[in-house]
Amino acid sequence: MRKGIIITASILLAAGLLIFIGGLLLGGGMKPMQFETKTYPITEPVADIRLDTHRTDILILPSPDGTLLVSAAEAERIHHTVTVQDGTLTIETVDERTWIDMLLPTFDQQMIVYLPETSYRSLSAQCRTGNVEIAKDFTFRSIDINNSTGGVSCNASATGRIRIEASTGDIALENVKAEELWLVVSTGRIAVKGAEIQKGVLLTVSTGKLEIDGLSCESLTSTGSTGRVTLRNIDVEHALWIERSTGDVNFENVGAETITVHTETGDVTGTLRSAFYFVTETNTGKVRVPDTHSGGRCEITTSTGDIRIEPADAQNP
């Protein structure tokens, strides 16, 4: 009896809250936030750029007139602080909305950072909901992006490390150069098209696809739980290591000193440019690899799946 009373009271309370909110909306008591674009011209010299934002898309673009300018959509209770101290440009979102404000639909807004120079010391961004896009015109000493919900598209290069992490969203890089490359996605896709990396590459995808087309590096390590791996036109100076729980692994014109692939469920197929001696194991699948006994070690194991590897020149006699 007591349990039934509690359930009934909860239902009535929820219904009353919905009626109250609906009355505010229909009666004009809750007006949608009106956004307008505000600009922040920067005259101080800047070497480092730091962003801490949420519910806004970020674009890093070359300045059309040689000035450093921040343009952002703002409302009465959502605005930004833009400061420069010791050569660091800091942009932060200030969210002063009430809980009632947050019940209203608020579409992601856009922020554009126009940079006059092509070279800067560092770019770091902590984003919560929103996409990040960095144009190809820039080179940083380091790039460090952490995005909770949203994608990251980076075409800029770094003399040091590029590190990008996304909880839910895709990461895309094209024609970049860096000393090191770290890309981490919990749920999403990693796509790299054209990358020259001096040292190591670390690619982690918990759930999602990994697609690389055109990469040179010293070493390549990729781990993940679920998702297909496709590597095309890859040149690894030393070790290539891939580990997956579920998902196919496909090579197209891949070269390395040594290759190691471990997957629980999935096929491992494709063409390798280098000569290898093969060590293979599959519980319920077929194995077809070149009968070679020289070159580097290529170890491929899968519990459920086929292993089919050919030399790259076999498709182009």
Cite the ranges covered by each PLM segment.
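Short hydrophobic/aromatic-rich motifs at helix boundaries and adjacent loops
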Residues: 20, 94-96
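Hydrophobic membrane-insertion alpha-helices, especially the h-region
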Residues: 6-24
